[in-house]
């Protein structure tokens, strides 16, 4: 058995560094979680342009945050958006695994199960996050920016394809549908409790604890 993991919102919660950065930069009383959700929507609208180098990282950061605030009838300046982005990146570089997720990787190591990470994103940013989560990166890391393909493209999943490979991710379309169409077994980490067709998904888990239990089951433990 081999297990590859998505990074963002699977091994850690994307919302956590956003929340901490907001608390440091802005004083406005607002539903921070809803603001974050809005920012993710606007991020996804133009993220492919960023990956294709049509826009800069700063332009992406300004766009997603200003648009999200605008939905709350609040205007912020480009400078405020960039100040937030700087603090946000700092918080992203100081993320950590939960205690149970640490157990997951301790178990995989002890049982000598091959594992790795497959993620979309820019190489430098993703490596920075992984270094924050793991003391030593002694496993394969596949990043879309480096290999030239991105989820849900079949080609990126074929890099890990094997009869006994499982892919763990929170994304329904880019992770589960993408991996499944490439012939890879899937574990959907549905921590948002989305209502979707799961008939083609091998396992659905809703917490770190459930993920650990499924992995033990797959390893006949």
Predicted features by range, described:
Residues 18-23, 58-66, 123:
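An amphipathic alpha-helix signature
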Residues 3, 122-221:
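Asp-based, Mg2+/Mn2+-dependent phosphohydrolase catalytic module
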Residues 1-41:
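Active-site neighborhood of HAD-like aspartate-dependent phosphohydrolases
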Residues 28-39, 71-84, 136-138:
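Short, surface-exposed acidic
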Residues 119:
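Conserved phosphate-coupling serine/threonine residues in phosphotransfer and NTP-handling enzymes
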Residues 58-59, 78, 86-116, 154:
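Short, acidic loop-to-helix structural element flanking the phosphoryl-transfer center
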Residues 45-85:
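A metal-dependent, Asp-based hydrolase signature
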């Amino acid at each position: 058995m081999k297990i590859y993991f998505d990074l963002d919102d699977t091994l850690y919660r994307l919302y956590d560094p956003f929340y901490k950065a907001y608390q440091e930069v802005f004083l406005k009383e607002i539903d921070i979680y809803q603001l974050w959700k809005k920012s993710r929507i606007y991020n996804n609208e133009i993220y492919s342009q960023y990956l294709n180098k049509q826009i800069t990282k700063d332009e992406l950061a300004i766009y997603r945050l200003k648009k999200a605030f605008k939905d709350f009838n609040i205007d912020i300046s480009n400078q405020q958006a960039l100040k937030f982005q700087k603090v946000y990146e700092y918080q992203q570089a100081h993320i950590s695994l939960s205690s149970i997720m640490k157990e997951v990787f301790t178990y995989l190591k002890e049982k000598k199960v091959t594992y790795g990470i497959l993620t979309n994103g820019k190489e430098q940013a993703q490596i920075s996050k992984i270094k924050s989560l793991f003391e030593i990166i002694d496993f394969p890391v596949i990043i879309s920016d480096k290999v030239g393909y991105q989820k849900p493209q079949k080609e990126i999943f074929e890099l890990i394809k094997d009869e006994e490979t499982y892919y763990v991710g929170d994304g329904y379309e880019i992770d589960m549908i993408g991996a499944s169409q490439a012939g890879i077994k899937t574990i959907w980490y549905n921590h948002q409790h989305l209502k979707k067709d799961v008939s083609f998904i091998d396992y659905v888990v809703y917490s770190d604890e459930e993920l650990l239990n499924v992995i033990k089951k797959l390893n006949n433990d």
